[in-house]
Amino acid sequence: MTKSFSDRVAEGTANHGTITPAELKEKMDANEAITVVDVRDANALGEGVIPGAKNVSLGTLFYKADPQSAFHDKETFQSTDQPIVFTCAGGGQASIAASVVAEYGFTNVTILEGGTRGWSAEGLPTEQAE
């Protein structure tokens, strides 16, 4: 049976859980070792990004997160047990991203509830994408 986008989003959220924007901000303020990965395409970052977030589009995630790939992004995906929070505009693509990296053995992945829009809606700071 074919899975729809909605099925994949629901599955990712159920399997990996979410973190609220306030909880993420608290962890960031406490300087917890956490990697925030924004999986939007570069041309969709005009709304702003969470400070310190790495941009790895969903399309490139498949090879950048794969430790076996010649194109593995070792700076962003350092260790399979590192805490990673995925975000996108609203959370859907982030849910799929969490499932993708879990297939590569990453065990500590979470989805930002509401995505970057949810972050902004709470009045939390954003910055312009580089």
How should each PLM-predicted stretch be described?
Residues 87:
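Short, surface-exposed ligand- or partner-binding patches at beta-edge/loop junctions that are enriched
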